Amino acid sequence: MERYAAALEEVADGARQQERHYQLLSALQSLVKELPSSFQQRLSYTTLSDLALALLDGTVFEIVQGLLEIQHLTEKSLYNQRLRLQNEHRVLRQALRQKHQEAQQACRPHNLPVVQAAQQRELEAVEHRIREEQRAMDQKIILELDRKVADQQSTLEKAGVAGFYVTTNPQELMLQMNLLELIRKLQQRGCRAGNAALGLGGPWQSPAAQCDQKGSPVPP
């Protein structure tokens, strides 16, 4: 009798999994219609079906939520670093202007052209330094964001999410961004309407609960 009950439960569980897969696939097919036609053509039925399978137990929603939170923290940190550098440059320029004004006021009139020429050379040197520091900061930001993208690609590939692998190809990156957007919108739909609206079971509640507490994830 126990064997029979276990077999029935296994069949019922399989049916529930099939239903969840169907609901996710239908939702994905509906969301894909909102994408540009060029990307719709690349998201075949097989790709969407594989994506729906990867989303079944809710783990991928958790992974995406975590990746986006890490990305946002990284972006905020890099933004603050650049802001600090800009403030340092602003203070440096103000101090240099003050120094030059005081020097001009203190010098004899016949020495003014010589002082001004020296000050112009100093100003050009400082502006060159500022440009170099800004360029280095921008390169650092680009490299750090590229590393984060590669980390996201690798993590989602290991999680079995269709369409994700490490690449720098612009078209593939755009496709992956669209796939992330589909996942995010599914998660938002779960936040707004609850699992019942999609016919999804318990495992998907955790990301929805996170949305209730922290707000919906923001696309990369």
Curated annotation (Swiss-Prot):
Transmembrane parts of this sequence: none
Tissue specificity as recorded in UniProt: Widely expressed in fetal and adult tissues. Highest expression in liver, heart and skeletal muscle. Lower levels in pancreas and placenta. Weak expression in brain.
Coiled coil region boundaries: 76-159
InterPro entries: Gonadal (IPR010849)
Keywords for this protein: Coiled coil, Nucleus, Phosphoprotein
Keyword match Nucleus: yes
CC per GO annotation: nucleus
Subcellular location: Nucleus
Lineage top rank: taxon: Eukaryota
Family: Belongs to the gonadal family.
Task of the protein: May play a role in neural crest cell migration into the third and fourth pharyngeal pouches.
Protein name (record): Protein DGCR6L
Phylogenetic lineage: Eukaryota, Metazoa, Chordata, Craniata, Vertebrata
